[in-house]
Amino acid sequence: MPNFTNFEALINVGKSYSIPQFMKAVIPVAGAGTKLRPLTYTQPKALIPIAGKTILSHIVDQLKDAGITEFIFIVGYLGAKIQDYVKQTYPDLTTHFVYQNERQGTGHAVELTKQLIGDEPIFVALGDTICEFDVKEIIDSPISMIGVHKVDDPRSFGVATIDDNGFIEQLVEKPSIPKSNLALVGLYKINETAVLFECLKQLFVENITTRGEYNLTDALACMLQKGTT
């Protein structure tokens, strides 16, 4: 199900950078939504209506209202429906569609956008994440941030441990024995994208996977280890 959670903590994961004039949003929506069947037999999960509009519109509207005008959608299952919906609903936005033909994880999905992003800062919002938070404040911040939320059982999530100053010390994807109950909610503002793509490449070269997938969490953990964040 979609994640209905507040942006409980904004965890600083980066050095201070000048605020970008423009920022691209990356929204992975390639999943088949098997947990929501039969609803997703004929439509992608992102187009399921919640509280009067689709999950995808909740996400796009929030980012658009904060000033983001360029979106990269990573599509796969029933991707043509998402592409048609976005073009009809948001004709004034600059949109790109990248196909993830084999769902190999969030890290693999983001890596597919490299040519469109280059080394520009990005805001990544997983396509089933609905949250209430001040997007503009996060975009305008000169630091990279990750959204987290306390949960009772974080073993099915990426998990963050933080220091006394609110900086991330460690990130682990779906740990069997979590060191904290701070789960990643699927919202990421990343300034150091050149390092991000370097770490994603490292995942593929070294075949670093969690439960058979290349995860964005593991790439962010790599960034921490490199000392760039």
Locate each region found by the language model:
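Conserved N-terminal catalytic core of the sugar/cofactor nucleotidyltransferase
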Residues: F7-I27, K35, P49, K53-L126, ...
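Active-site glycine-centered loops adjacent to acidic/histidine catalytic or metal-binding residues
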Residues: G31, D128, K150
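Conserved donor-nucleotide/metal-binding helix-loop-beta segment in metal-dependent transferases, i.e.
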Residues: F133-R155
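A structural signal for short hydrophobic beta-strand segments in well-ordered beta-sheet cores
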Residues: L47, A160-I162
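Short N-terminal binding/cap micro-motifs at the start of the first secondary-structure element
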Residues: G33-P38, R155
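Conserved beta-strand segments of alpha/beta enzyme cores
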Residues: A46, T94-H96, F167, T229
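Catalytic-core segments of class I nucleotidyltransferases/pyrophosphorylases
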Residues: F167-T229
